Regions:
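The right-handed parallel beta-helix/beta-solenoid scaffold, focusing on the short coil/turn
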Residues: 2, 9-11, 18, 66, ...
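Tryptophan-centered short beta-strand motifs
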Residues: 3, 63-72
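Extracellular/surface-exposed low-complexity repeats and stalk/linker segments enriched in Gly/Pro
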Residues: 4-53, 72
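Low-complexity, glycine/proline-biased repetitive segments and flexible coils/loops
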Residues: 29, 63-64, 82-380
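Short beta-strand segments and strand-loop junctions that repeat across beta-rich extracellular domains
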Residues: 53-66
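Extracellular/luminal ectodomains of metazoan preproproteins built from arrays
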Residues: 72-75, 341-343
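Short "repeat-start/strand-capping" segments in structured domains, especially the N-termini
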Residues: 73-75, 80-84
């Protein structure tokens, strides 16, 4: 007969030279069709062999919520699941102008939020969290009616789940077009966002979001107007210094969550008044799209949330804006934890995942496989 329960406080096995055989089974909970009992308050202290990972695990509430944790050979048995994050939204697209129009504003960078230098998240194992990685604002192609069109905003990036405050980085604002009002206008003014879009008409750029980005710049004061740069996470977009020079995009910010300092969220450059003459504004930190005196603006760098740069129309051809760069979510946590499982990716195939290490930490990077907003569920 098998021994199923011991009623004494101590079991003396000191004379036994063999081993204690414990329960074993795969690492999937019975509630999901596996063999592992759900860890809850009634079985705290239970141990078993996880045959999926070939490790011994214990049901514990050391992290605050009952969960299975692996036993380690050395060091502390339980390492808290403390997660640093970098969340960047998609950058805004630049504006565009019709033939014989003036310059257009650069797109604002996507909002940037990070725990580096601040407070990391405390997450729980066997718990699902949702992520959304935002696409960049689509470029405005050379439309003829109406003659002036502002750029599209980038899409938000977000991390959410039970027990934490949702973290939402706001998409970058679209750049304004080469006119400010009238029947020829379609969303001509720049848009607010994580960082604000630059303006292509007399006046100020759009506002950025406090704690995430900065404002777009100011356009040249007289007609025909050169346009300003979109705001970046590190600084506001620059104003157009004169009618033949577009304003530079705002600077991005450097972040070392991966172990390597990398720039994110630069603003897009504005375009000059006239095609073929003058100079477009530079994209912020060389990751925002450059403005140009040519017809087609340059795109913001993908996976950085940077704004698109603007182009300049000729007397007979419409300009085309640059697209904003897609956003990114990066998570950093102790290497003793495996990469979270991924599910519910929408659209299917839309998420690119990179699993790397930096010393004692694992670094997970999530980006759009194409410039399309993608969502998914992570389970640690």
């Amino acid at each position: 007969m098998a021994l199923t329960k011991v009623s004494t406080g101590v079991v003396d096995m000191s004379q036994d030279t063999g081993g204690l055989v414990i329960a074993k089974g795969n690492g999937t909970d019975v509630s999901s069709g596996g063999e592992r009992p759900t860890c809850n308050a009634t079985i705290l202290g239970s141990i078993r062999e996880n045959t999926t990972e070939n490790k011994v695990e214990v049901c514990t509430a050391g992290g605050g919520t009952p969960a299975w944790q692996f036993l380690e050979e050395a060091g502390p048995s339980f390492v808290p699941l403390t997660v640093d994050y970098l969340i960047v939204a998609g950058g805004g697209g630049s504006g565009a102008a019709g033939a014989a129009g003036s310059g257009s504003g650069g797109g604002g960078a996507g909002g940037l939020l990070t725990s580096i230098g601040s407070t990391a998240l405390s997450l729980n194992t066997s718990t699902s969290y949702s992520i959304t990685v935002g696409e960049g604002g689509t470029p405005v192609t050379g439309v003829t009616t109406p003659r002036y069109t502002g750029g599209d905003n980038g899409s938000d990036s977000e991390f959410s789940g039970t027990g934490i405050t949702t973290i939402t980085a706001i998409g970058g604002g679209g750049g304004g077009s080469g006119s400010g009002s009238g029947s020829n206008c379609n969303n001509c003014l720049p848009n607010a966002g994580g960082s604000g879009g630059g303006t292509g008409f007399a006046g100020n750029g759009a506002a950025g979001t406090a704690g995430q980005g900065n404002d777009g710049g100011i356009s040249a004061s007289g007609a025909p107007y050169a346009a300003s740069g979109g705001g970046g996470a590190g600084s506001a977009g620059s104003g157009a210094p004169n009618n033949s020079t577009g304003g530079n995009g705002g600077l991005g910010l450097s972040n070392s969550i991966t172990g390597t300092a990398t720039l994110y969220a630069g603003g897009g450059g504005g375009s000059p008044s006239y095609n073929g003459t003058g100079t477009g504004g530079s994209g912020g930190s060389n990751i925002g799209g450059d403005g140009t005196s040519g017809l087609v603006g340059n795109n913001g760098t993908v996976n950085t949330g940077s704004g698109g740069g603007a182009g300049s129309p000729t007397t007979s051809s419409n300009s085309t804006g640059g697209a904003g760069g897609s956003g990114v979510i990066i998570l950093r946590f102790p290497i003793s934890y495996s990469a979270p499982t991924i599910s519910n990716i929408s659209p299917a195939g839309g998420l690119t995942i990179t699993n790397s290490t930096d010393g004692t930490h694992r670094v997970m990077t999530y980006t759009c496989a194409t410039n399309t907003t993608v969502s998914a569920t992570l389970t640690f």
